[in-house]
């Protein structure tokens, strides 16, 4: 049963993170007028799909990512060229609404035509010899029209609906929106947790066994007002003061029953693991703070938690990238789907609150990792847009696509190595 719970939790966490990320791309793409033929969660064979307006929404078998397919985002060429024989369906204005490429269709009242000239981006037309009269005709293509192949519809995208022909600013927003929506999701989750749990205060709720707070006699209800020379008004002040005092003997002042008292104690040094190869040193008194529920404090605390988590993850990512050049890199620094599954298994056992917190941190991590300037990632593609904005011309499309393809192959190789490393460490 525990395996089933972990699998369900993993699918939900993965699905939420990828859906939010890809929806960010699609939201800004559609606002910019870019056609999005497909919105996919997962990779590989399609297991479920439905169409809404011009977008096909699909869920695919392998939980290793997702994508939004945008018109003009690659070197794809129209499937029709001069010399081909196709069938066309016309509307009442004698405009082409469907270009049928095979016999796997149910359309009636269609015309067969041998294509002589065609344009699917600017002038939108097909010119050719029709079978019914063996004469040459010129047909305009309707603004909303489709290629039909194997029973599937692919909408034709005019030039002004293609990603490649948009200005740098909407391109940048479309690419940056994926990570941005991950950051927004994390922020919402942190704020939601703060509202649910309350914001921590400097009042003691519970002391931990064999920690300085218990050994010094602190009790439930004691309100800490000073550590060393540092005044305390909220729980964050406790952490800041202890970071400065470290594990040196210090005086702690607290209020109990309306009276101010003081004790001397030595904070305990602890190590908190951030990643598989890095950790953070913390100094603690060993007490659980009481929480309070107010209207606005959870928003502030949620922002602070988001900034702290983002800073820690950003520092870890920068350290990982630096280690590539300093010789300290290890695949243990990275987590693939198998590693994330293992982490979810551990977090689920701690409860739903821990799972939500982990999801928030994972969302931040996904956003930051996608901004790394590797061609296949959002960060690498943003570099191409910055180049276009500076030099007032886009990178050669063939060169850009080749570089992105190389980056994609690199990422696939890395993913395979990381996945094997995770399997070896966790299951072998």
Curated annotation (Swiss-Prot):
The protein's required cofactor(s) are namely: Zn(2+)
Entry's EC annotation: 3.4.24.-
Instruction: Tell me which GO cellular component terms the UniProt record holds.
Output: plasma membrane
> What topology does the record note for this protein and the membrane?
Multi-pass membrane protein
Query: One GO molecular-function annotation for this sequence?
Result: metalloendopeptidase activity
Amino-acid positions noted as binding Zn(2+) in the UniProt annotation, renumbered to this chain? 21, 25
UniProt keyword annotations, A-Z:
Cell membrane, Hydrolase, Membrane, Metal-binding, Metalloprotease, Protease, Transmembrane, Transmembrane helix, Zinc
Domain spans labelled PDZ: 186-269
UniProt KW Cell membrane keyword: yes
Protein's cellular compartments: Cell membrane
Q: Which InterPro entries match?
A: PDZ, PDZ_sf, Pept_M50_Zn, Peptidase_M50
A Pfam family for this UniProt protein?
Answer: PDZ_2
| Regions crossing the membrane | 172-194, 309-331, 352-374, 401-420
* Gene Ontology biological process: proteolysis
Q: Where is the active site?
A: 22
Which family would the database say this protein is a member of? Belongs to the peptidase M50B family.
Alphabetized PANTHER family for the sequence: MEMBRANE METALLOPROTEASE ARASP2, CHLOROPLASTIC-RELATED, REGULATOR OF SIGMA-E PROTEASE RSEP
- According to UniProt, the name of this protein is Putative zinc metalloprotease SAS1196
What organism is recorded for this protein? Staphylococcus aureus (strain MSSA476)
